[in-house]
Amino acid sequence: MKAIVTGISGQDGHYAARHLLARGFAVTGLTSDPDKIAGVQAEFGDQPVTIESFDYAAPRAIEAVIERVRPAVILNYAAKSTGTGMFDRAFEMARLNGAFVLDILEAIRAIDPTIGFCQASSAEMYGHVDTSPQDERTCFRPKSPYGAAKLYAHNLIGTYRNAYGLKCSSAILYNHESVRRTTHFVTRKIARAAAEISLARAASFSLGGLDALRDWGYAPEYAEAMVLMALSDKPADYVLATGTLTSVEQVCRICFEHVGLDFRDYLVIDPALQRPIETTNVCGDPSAIARDLGWRATTGIQDILVEMVDFDLQTLRGAPALGHTTC
């Protein structure tokens, strides 16, 4: 059995590949950065993984890859990320986060309609929320180019599933973290700061505020859910979430208490770091996927954050990094 994983050099692509390997798949992983190929390939050792450079901006180029590999499943994690500068990259975001999914769907329709395809959608599609928790029937009102492009792709998935009977599905992903996150994301930024300050490598850290609430889960578990969705004979869209909100302040407290410190002694609030257009306080209802596929998020936020801080402590002390590879 063969699988294609786009965005394999990212957090989710890595864990998805691990889950697929555990199920006996040979994986072709695509990355837009040729400089990452050797490093990503080395992480998988002698396992049946092939890493290839791919230009996601090239219209319909994915068709040739699918024709050559002939996968049983495809998982798409390729995306321009949310955050600062989104409006400056709106065209790129529309192409990669939206139109590229159309390329995949058209290729599947032409080559092999039995391919199982799971798309990484996002809770940022909800945007302005007035109900909580959100589920698969909650109205989407995105506030950003990222959310709008993801919603375009999400709607395409449903359209092609209904019109052509394709085995395609969308995972509406809420925030999901691991040691493979970059410090662009607030949980990793805080965990790294706790480790650095505890080792006297830094004196302070800055955040835009403490009040924001998020539904944070564990990335390896969410990758597993997407594999289950891609393999399902009854494709559907599902919310992947924990159903529990955690504040940025709680994240700070957990990380710093783990190293015996009070975060308030080191935090600098910088209003310039606030992101007013963000989707705020979204909390997902994962009951549908629990009912249909038996999947539930089981790793709590405290365990996730402690793993991150310990990873950074070891890295900063010069020990080998604690790469998370068990799936």
Which residues are covered by each model-predicted region?
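Amphipathic terminal alpha-helices
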Residues: K2, G300-C327
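NAD(P)H-binding glycine-rich loop region in Rossmannoid oxidoreductase-like domains
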Residues: Y56-L96
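Conserved Rossmann-fold NAD(P)-dependent oxidoreductase catalytic core, especially the SDR/UDP-sugar
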Residues: N76, L102-P145
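N-terminal Rossmann/SDR dinucleotide-binding element
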Residues: M1-V73
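Conserved C-terminal active-site "lid" loop/helix of NAD(P)H-dependent oxidoreductases
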Residues: A219, P271-R296, T315
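Active-site helix of classical SDR
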Residues: P145, A149-Y152
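NAD(P)-dependent short-chain dehydrogenase/reductase
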Residues: D130-P133, N155-A230, T244-L245, C252-V259
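Mid/C-terminal beta-alpha module of Rossmann-like enzyme folds, strongest
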Residues: I190, L228-R275, P286
